[in-house]
């Protein structure tokens, strides 16, 4: 109770810094929302969530301006927002305007991409997500592969040995729904100890097939979300809490709830929409990935999996520590995704070489590597948000203090006010 009271007090303090809407800035924010909706008419999937006035979407879809017209509108809008930022003496207004200007700049570059423009991988990430990813040489991951080799002794290729080891921890398809739902429920219970949510908030689970992603959260507004989990490939027991925390609590569902709160309670119109490609990406995906270690610090993840999820899945809890050790080591390979994506998208290697490198450095089977290559084809530099975004959020939370309560307060502060990646850097 003390923890949630402290966090509630923090939220009130943060929200007190959110000034009453500036009329001029709200007018420009509306223009940004309408611009984004019209971009969505040119690119399916650009608008990830929208819960503003229905007539704005209807108008945008019925009569979208051309991409050339939208570019001119974005340039003019960006200049107007920057003028407000320069003229205002209020810290909260300047922060909001600075954040909104970055959103518009990202949308402007996305329009160039819709028209066929391409930039080198790192520059594309900077222009879309306002974050510079750290790209390490693939050789930096060779020591991690050596550690994993020691964890999974035997003969043959390391990727094959890892696949055989992980196959022991696959959740049977007929138990997947129950296991993932149990994980979601526990992620929610732990999140509610630190973050207040509306009574009507709800998060439902649907199993689907045929997508390049493994899971996706659709935030529908009014504090309601649906997570879709793709079942084309088997899910391992260590995926369950990742799904529950990343897509749900304290990840995308909670992020959506707090963004909608900025819109409805504080009239920050720009938060009525969530474009897929925007500077919110590193914060949302990084925050989602950080959700597991935030909700299950230290050994708590392993303890819950052993006591609750392994029995539900019909797996032996005594084998959980070995699986956890391998999963922890494999997490240290995550940055290799960015290096491979950069080499592939910048034309240094072809798709077949990218798939081979994904198999080698992420220890994936051919089918899973092919699926991830499809994800890179579809979302391009978006992949940085999972890795660089996690580093960003984790670093910010750790600098807030050594204890878990401090990390929760830091995370809540990110959700409760306009925030750009640069705001979270040292």
Where are these regions (language model features)?
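N-terminal maturation segment of proteins
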Residues: 17-426
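Bacterial N-terminal signal peptides
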Residues: 5-13
